Amino acid sequence: MNKSKEAETDITQIFPNLDILPKKFSAKELAERRIKKLHVAPGSIFMNRWSIEGVIGNGGYGQIFMVMDVKKNDERAMKIEPKLRAEVITKRMIMEQQVLMKMQGKTHIPTMYASGFNDQFNFIIMQLLSMNVGDFRKRSPLGRLSKETVGRIAYQTLNALKDIHDMGYVHRDVKPANICFGVHAQNRHILYLLDFGLVRRFKTESGVCIPWRINAGFKGTERYVSVRVHEKLEQTPWDDAFSVLYTAYELVVGELPWRYLEDIHEIHGVKKLMNEVTKNGEMFKDIASILVDFHKMILECDPVVELPYEKLLECLKCLYSPKSLLEPYDWEDGYKTTLNI
């Protein structure tokens, strides 16, 4: 994939009515979201290089800004994380920096242009991407995406995870909010996996599996983690694959069966019920039925054995065939494919 400046053509030059960039929050929206403190001020210049254009993301672990490289006149994204949280040094972004550095050059990993820290926060300057696929789903008139689009999202996500797993890491936080696409004509159909703050090694650089902890704790987002994570077992690539399943289910149906449950034990119970093949018919009815084979295939895998990636990818390819990865996604055709389901 050519990432040179000369090769980049703004996608809006080809699709002038296509709005795929993450939205910058207004002052009113920042107040409504109770964002009391911005660690850098819009309009300021960070490190004599990056002009702060506005806030495009905010979460429990930090903030994301759209920035302009004043030397190259290119838009980028800057992610920051306070160095201290509740008087404790935070290490989430330090891990993310390390993993991103090792993964540079992989198709589904965003380009990192700079990283470091000052006396207040750690930061990463990276490639500017589209809004996440969860937001694309919410924009759909039906609140869901077509099976052709979801199949290609799941296929590319699993490919991204294979690269990460091959490096000896499990992601542990696969979900729609961490999946985006490129914003240039050359990469608008390329999926990028984000947020490596929860990654953990499951094998050494030489390929030796790391011994499991007796109690691995709970890491991830409740809605998208596997049954094994609820049971505080050590996570493996198998658990990442289950998060792909839950992500695909939410995107194609519009919501997960446990969407309105708040008790983590109840969520665990519904997920266990879904895994009982003889009882999951109700949860895989209608459009969700397209995911039955993928679900069964993961269940047949041993969590301690390497995933049969090619077999799983072929299963996902059936969801979008005969379309290709390079054909328009739902948000490019005004969600016409979704409306024709």
UniProtKB/Swiss-Prot annotation:
Mind telling me which Pfam families this protein's record contains?
Answer: Pkinase
**Catalytic activity, EC:** 2.7.11.1
Superkingdom: Eukaryota
How is this protein annotated for GO cellular component?
cytoplasm; nucleus
The active-site annotation reads 173
In what residue span(s) does the Protein kinase domain sit? 50-326
The family classification in the record reads: Belongs to the protein kinase superfamily. CK1 Ser/Thr protein kinase family. Casein kinase I subfamily.
Which terms are listed as keywords in the entry?
Answer: ATP-binding, Kinase, Nucleotide-binding, Serine/threonine-protein kinase, Transferase
Which residues does the annotation say bind ATP? 56-64, 79
State the reactions this protein catalyses. L-seryl-[protein] + ATP = O-phospho-L-seryl-[protein] + ADP + H(+); L-threonyl-[protein] + ATP = O-phospho-L-threonyl-[protein] + ADP + H(+)
Q: Which molecular function GO terms apply here?
A: ATP binding; protein serine kinase activity; protein serine/threonine kinase activity
Q: Does the keyword Transferase apply?
A: yes
The protein's matches in PANTHER family, at most eight in alphabetical order, are given as:
CASEIN KINASE-RELATED
Q: What is this protein called?
A: Putative casein kinase I C03C10.2
GO terms for biological process, alphabetical: signal transduction
SUPFAM superfamilies for this protein = Protein kinase-like (PK-like)
